[in-house]
């Protein structure tokens, strides 16, 4: 029987702050911050190559009951479905948005899987401006 990949939790503030320097993947239900650990960091934390995940639900989302409900939904979605897509030796922080509370569970799991596997993708059709625009007239003069 194939053993499940163990997903560990981020619990310390320093771990959350380290992940903030990584890649950010935005979605309608949450923001996902992703950072790959170096081998030295994995050895120091004694985590091996297991992925780690942390959850942030701010007071802007509601009172403690609502925040905990959002956190529980995200944890269950990771445990049941999206955890299998997580890369080894990678830390994930999920910053929940208010819409995560009322979204259908299937949509939540699909969005999590999409954000976990979307490595460095940019929206096509949008060009980044590389040069500053020419200065135009001030106040229509």
Curated annotation (Swiss-Prot):
EC class of the enzyme, as a word: hydrolase
Cellular component GO terms, alphabetical: ribonuclease P complex
Catalyzed reactions: Endonucleolytic cleavage of RNA, removing 5'-extranucleotides from tRNA precursor
Pfam families per the UniProt record, alphabetical: Ribonuclease_P
Record has Nuclease as a keyword: yes
Biased composition range(s): Basic and acidic residues: 114-123
EC number(s) per entry: 3.1.26.5
Annotated InterPro entries: Ribosomal_Su5_D2-typ_SF (IPR020568), Ribsml_uS5_D2-typ_fold_subgr (IPR014721), RNase_P (IPR000100), RNase_P_CS (IPR020539)
Keywords: Endonuclease, Hydrolase, Nuclease, RNA-binding, tRNA processing
Listed SUPFAM superfamilies: Ribosomal protein S5 domain 2-like
GO biological process: tRNA 5'-leader removal
Region annotation Disordered: where it falls in the sequence: 37-56, 114-141
GO molecular function: 3'-tRNA processing endoribonuclease activity; ribonuclease P activity; tRNA binding
Functional summary from the UniProt entry: RNaseP catalyzes the removal of the 5'-leader sequence from pre-tRNA to produce the mature 5'-terminus. It can also cleave other RNA substrates such as 4.5S RNA. The protein component plays an auxiliary but essential role in vivo by binding to the 5'-leader sequence and broadening the substrate specificity of the ribozyme.
Subunit details: Consists of a catalytic RNA component (M1 or rnpB) and a protein subunit.
Family: Belongs to the RnpA family.
Protein name: Ribonuclease P protein component
Gene, per the UniProt record: rnpA
């Amino acid at each position: 029987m194939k053993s499940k990949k163990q997903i560990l939790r981020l619990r310390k503030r320093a771990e959350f702050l380290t992940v903030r320097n990584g890649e950010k993947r935005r979605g309608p239900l949450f923001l996902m911050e992703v950072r790959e650990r170096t081998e030295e960091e994995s050895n120091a934390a004694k985590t091996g190559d297991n992925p780690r995940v942390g959850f942030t639900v701010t007071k802007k989302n509601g009172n403690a009951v609502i925040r905990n409900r959002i956190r529980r939904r995200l944890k269950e979605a990771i445990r049941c479905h999206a955890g299998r897509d997580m890369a080894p030796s990678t830390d994930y922080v999920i910053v929940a948005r208010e819409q995560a509370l009322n979204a259908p569970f299937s949509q939540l799991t699909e969005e999590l899987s999409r954000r976990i596997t979307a490595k460095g993708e940019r929206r096509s059709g949008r060009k980044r401006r590389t040069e500053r625009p020419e200065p135009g007239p001030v106040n229509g003069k």
